[in-house]
Regions:
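N-terminal periplasmic "start-of-domain" segments of outer-membrane beta-barrel proteins
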Residues: 42-78, 131
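Extracytoplasmic beta-strand/coil segments of soluble accessory domains associated
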Residues: 81-127
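Short acidic/polar hinge/loop motifs at secondary-structure boundaries
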Residues: 110-111, 126-154
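Short loop/turn motifs that connect adjacent beta-strands in outer-membrane beta-barrel proteins
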Residues: 176-182, 213-219, 285, 371-373, ...
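Transmembrane beta-barrel wall of Gram-negative outer-membrane proteins
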Residues: 197-330, 352-363, 368, 672
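Outer-membrane beta-barrel signature, preferentially recognizing the C-terminal barrel domain
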Residues: 349-357, 692-761, 767-769, 788-816, ...
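C-terminal beta-signal and adjacent terminal beta-strands/loops
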Residues: 483, 487, 904-925, 929-932, ...
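Gram-negative outer-membrane beta-barrel transporters
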Residues: 765-769, 773, 778-780, 784-915, ...
């Protein structure tokens, strides 16, 4: 660390000295510099941006697709994530996070390229990331108003930084010398959400840039600021997983969910960005720029949700229920055969998060002579985030639920009496609280030095080589307990430590609730009953509000103790907090050292000219992690004097200690890019390379819990004990010894450019992945009392599978200039991507019958999925990968008018296997050989899929004069429904339906 700082200071001092040396020559150099053209000419307008992006693709040394801002601060969508989905081969998720599919994201979230989520993110060709336990940027955190464009590299060269098997996304900002002189850009927008009526969200940006000739050369300065708010609402229906039931319809098995539920969520976010750049050019040979980039993201959502909480095997059906051909319930009236009603929880949940990323970078480029040039680049980036997730729930026993699951969306029917019952606060009781806190910080420092030697040769063009050094420290911390679920009053506690529930009808427990009427639910397409929810203040008031609620439980507990004369049997509530458990802390330190060499060449005198580059990148990665391993010996009872037989049982002392882990590996990454020019407008590319993606930091946590499980039988009369079995197992939250996933990738393209904004391109690709990270077992050893090493089989992330992604990308764009009159402004953009994938574990974990609980150690469940009838699935594709996706955009640019209507669609994709809402531990054991056959004790986890989804967006702008334009934008014009499917033996069953409604934006722009 100290050496890195000293080197950085020395480098900076050397660069300042270099600038000072050239100051004396600046006056004579100014006359030469005055005639220099700016590095980049900013294009304006939709057509101009398409032309510029096509030119980047056509001239690039690598396979790349680009999007260029139409004007200052004007990318074609409201978020970087939504912009990326327009690129061929790129898809985005529609949930807030990949671990929580129950909450919809209006602006999109995780990005995949060619079906792979291992995507590297960069800002101006440098590392960029968020403090989220991963390695990439949360693109939704970045203000699109600060971007000049973005590039998506599909098969990067040796010169580019390693780390993205799926691809590389480089976000580009402007520099002062990109403009000929002074430049000002101002924009203002306001967005209206149709579903969240009455909510207007302002946005705006301002950019100032200028350049001056001085005594030490030309100097430029640029300042850019963006502010954006978004307020949206999402409504959702959900159906619980289906359970096999042989006790409802005589003589046959039918599949019945335990309920249908609904929710509504209001989401608010603020996004700010600040960017500044200083640029200096002493003469034609020496230039430097210093940039500062800061993005801040704040979000808060509050949700009112109903969820089924009954025992699924207590659910009964009134006569007249109907079923699908596979036996799944279609229509019927449900009731609870044991309790007074179907148990539901209805919660008020809030989540808030603040995140920021700060990047400071300094670049110096020096051309020593006609042959040699050198570049030095220094960067420091810091990312932080912290959040609170807080839930307070009441409970209600719904008398009945009449459902119709035969249509596109679940339909619910309630009588007036049932609606009145659900709207009455006296029907509810206080149920539970749950909170989670997290905070993370990551700091990275990087320096790279590159050199280029330009040949005077008919074939060899230049040789590029360089080195790069980085150091990144990361700390991710979760509260202890992680998600602290704490009961206030539950039906299963009755007769145990309480005699009554904490009913709101009891004056001691009343108040601070409200009636949610679900106005305009599903944009008026569904009529659900009003429900009583806790006030939001209970959730936002953590921890004091929680303490007050858990006093209700203490009152009930003391009441039972007084009535029975027994001692109180109630646990004291404690809030989740940081510290106290090393399982919540993940500290990582990583250093990388890389070098590369790349030769560019061109056979221009061939009949069909060929050019390209060949190179190799070598990188060494050194990782250190702070960890913790815990082992508590089991307690076994063997009567004194018994003879013990069976397998030997080692005596292992209690073990609980901090662990220091170190891991290092190196990768050699060759690459080849070739381009054949059949004509000036027709070219073909071939690219082949080896790529790598390092494990996410969250997967590298060095925490493990070890368990010694001894099963024995005591034979009392015979005075003997038989050890039936002894196993040494464990669970790891991560694995600090993970290696990167690697891939060999091949691309072949054909590109026809038949106009300035007109082209047809086709790309074939094949990626072969090795060491894909999956949940499997690895060995861990600790000594017993005799010093003999004992081997524990620990379940955690390992490099345990190989994979494949093969497909094709097709893109077409054209303006129809030859059409008559106003029609000559019409244009079209179309692209389509097909991806086929597969994974194969090194060691198969599939079992036709599931067993065990819903834990990390259940490999069959976590990798293959298990149904509620205890049967495994297997044969699942790579997650987040859609086999088909496409974009269609109708464009218009004529005179002052510019318009676009864009449709984006992707086919269904696997979101997860063991995720919230579609997992449990009460599946049926259907294995005939199992001693618990027929019991409800098997862990289950359903593969959850996002169904096909398409969305229509549109924009219209009018250029009032050279400086001013006005416009309208619309997102999700067709009010699309996002649907989720849960895979079960009876088919792909509807799990959830989400709507967020259209959004409309009015905007004005001014620039000169």
């Amino acid at each position: 660390m100290k050496q890195f700082k000293l080197n950085a200071i020395a480098l900076a001092a050397a660069q300042i000295a270099l600038m000072s040396t050239h100051a004396a020559h600046a006056q004579s150099a100014q006359s030469n510099a005055a005639g220099d053209a700016p590095v980049t000419v900013v294009v304006t307008g939709q057509r101009g941006s398409i032309e510029s992006a096509q030119k980047i693709k056509q001239d690039s040394d690598e396979i790349v697709d680009s999007i260029v801002a139409e004007d200052i601060g004007k990318l074609p969508d409201r978020s970087v994530t939504e912009v990326l989905q327009r690129v061929v081969g790129v898809t985005i998720d529609r949930t807030m996070s990949r671990g929580d599919p129950e909450h919809y994201s209006v602006e999109g979230s995780g990005v995949s390229i060619r079906g792979l989520s291992m995507v590297r993110s960069e800002l101006n060709g440098r590392d960029s990331f968020s403090a989220n336990g991963g390695r990439s940027l949360n693109f939704e955190d970045v203000p699109p108003e600060l971007m000049a464009g973005l590039d998506v590299y599909k098969n990067p060269s040796a010169e580019q930084i390693e780390g993205g098997i799926g691809g590389l996304v480089n976000l580009r900002t402007a520099l002062p010398f990109d403009f000929k002189g002074a430049k000002v850009g101002i924009s203002a927008q306001s967005t209206y959400s149709e579903l969240r009526k009455g909510k207007w969200s302002p946005s705006g940006s301002v950019m100032l840039s200028n350049r001056w000739k001085t005594g030490i050369g030309e100097i430029g300065a640029l300042f850019d600021y963006a502010y954006s708010e978004s307020g949206t609402r999402t409504d959702g229906f959900q159906v619980e997983p289906y359970y096999p039931r042989d006790d409802i319809e005589p003589g046959k098995t039918v599949w019945v969910p335990k309920g249908t539920q609904w929710r509504t969520l209001n989401f608010d976010r603020k996004r700010q960005g600040m960017y500044g750049a200083l640029q200096w050019k002493a003469n034609a040979d020496l230039r430097s720029h210093l940039t500062y980039f800061k993005s801040k993201y704040e979000m808060q959502w509050d949700e009112q949700a109903l969820f089924a909480a009954s025992n699924p095997y207590n659910i009964g059906l009134r006569p007249g229920a109907t079923y699908s051909p596979t036996g799944a319930l279609l229509t019927g009236t449900m009731f609870d055969r044991v309790d007074a009603g179907i148990n539901f929880g209805d919660d008020t949940r809030i989540a808030n998060r603040k995140s920021d990323t700060t990047d400071i970078s300094w670049n110096v480029t020096w051309r020593a002579n006609d042959r040699w040039s050198f570049t030095s680049d220094l960067q420091r980036i810091k990312a932080r985030t912290h959040g609170l997730d807080s839930t307070v729930a009441t409970g209600v026993q719904m008398p009945e639920q009449q459902i119709d699951l035969s249509g596109n969306v679940p339909s619910l029917m309630f009588t007036d009496a049932q609606r009145a019952y659900l709207a009455n606060p006296n029907s509810y009781y206080w149920a539970f609280t749950q909170e989670h806190l997290d905070r993370s910080e990551a700091v990275s420092k990087a320096w790279k030095g590159d050199a280029k030697y330009t040949f005077d040769h008919p074939v060899l063009r230049d040789l590029r080589f360089g080195v790069r050094f980085t150091k990144r420290d990361s700390v991710n911390e979760n509260s202890n307990p992680d998600f602290n679920w704490s009961p206030i009053s539950q039906t299963w506690q009755l007769g145990n430590n309480i005699n009554n529930l904490a009913w709101l009808a009891d004056p001691r427990f009343s108040g601070a609730t409200h009636l949610t009427t679900f106005n305009n639910f599903f944009n008026g397409k569904a009529n659900v009953p009003s429900l009583v929810f806790p006030d939001t203040s209970w959730a936002t008031g953590f921890p004091n509000s929680y303490a007050a609620l858990h006093e209700f439980h203490n009152i009930l507990c003391a009441e039972r103790a007084a009535a029975t004369g027994q001692a109180q049997n109630c646990a004291t509530w404690s809030p989740a907090k940081f510290g106290g458990n090393p399982a919540g802390i993940n500290e990582q330190s990583e250093k990388t050292k890389a070098m590369f060499g790349q030769l560019r060449f061109g056979f221009d005198d061939w009949k069909y000219p060929v050019d390209g580059n060949v190179g190799v990148r070598y990188v060494k990665t050194e990782m250190e992690a702070r960890g913790f391993t815990n082992f508590t010996p089991p307690t076994v009872t063997i009567p004194p004097g018994n003879t013990v037989t069976g397998p030997a049982v080692p005596t292992i002392p209690a073990f609980s200690a901090d662990q220091a882990y170190a891991n290092s590996y190196h990768n050699v990454l060759p690459s080849l890019n070739l381009r054949l020019k059949a004509r000036d407008d027709l070219q073909f590319r071939f690219a082949m390379s080896k790529a790598m993606s390092r494990p996410d930091f969250k997967d590298l946590q060095g925490y493990a819990t070890l368990t010694q499980d001894i099963k024995l039988t005591n034979f009392i009369p015979e005075r003997r004990t038989v050890i039936d079995s002894m196993t040494l197992t464990g669970e790891g939250k991560g694995n600090p010894l993970l290696r990167p996933t690697t891939a060999t990738q091949v691309d072949l393209t054909a590109e026809w450019y038949f106009g300035r904004a007109s082209s047809v391109t086709v790309a074939l690709f094949n990626k072969r992945l090795k060491d894909v990270i999956v949940q499997q077992s690895y060995d861990y050893q600790i000594p017993d009392v005799n010093g003999t090493m004992q081997n524990f089989t620990v379940t955690g992330p390992v490099n345990g599978a190989r994979g494949r992604a093969t497909g094709v990308e097709i893109a077409y764009q054209q303006y129809f200039d030859k059409l008559p009159g106003a029609l000559s402004g019409l244009g079209v953009q179309v692209n389509y991507t097909f991806v086929d994938s597969s994974t194969k574990p090194y060691n198969s974990t599939f079992s036709a019958y599931c067993s065990g609980g819903n834990t990390a150690s259940n490999l069959n469940l976590n990798q293959n999925g298990c149904d509620t009838n205890g049967r495994g699935f297997g044969d699942l594709p790579l997650q987040y990968l859609s086999r088909n996706s496409y974009n269609v955009a109708i464009l218009y640019d004529k005179g002052p008018w510019s318009a676009r209507a864009a449709w984006s669609w992707r086919s269904k994709n696997l979101q997860g296997i063991n995720v919230n809402g579609t997992k449990g531990g009460d599946g049926v054991d259907t294995n005939p050989a199992s001693p618990t056959f027929g019991q409800h004790n098997v862990g289950w986890a359903l593969p959850l899929w996002a169904d096909d989804y398409g969305q229509l967006d549109a924009s219209l702008s009018y250029q009032i004069n050279e400086r001013t334009s006005i416009g309208l934008e619309a997102q999700n014009l067709t009010d699309a429904k996002a649907k989720q499917l849960m895979q079960q033996g009876i088919g792909q069953m509807g799990r959830a339906w989400f709507v967020s409604g259209p959004r409309y934006t009015a905007q004005m722009r001014y620039s000169f």
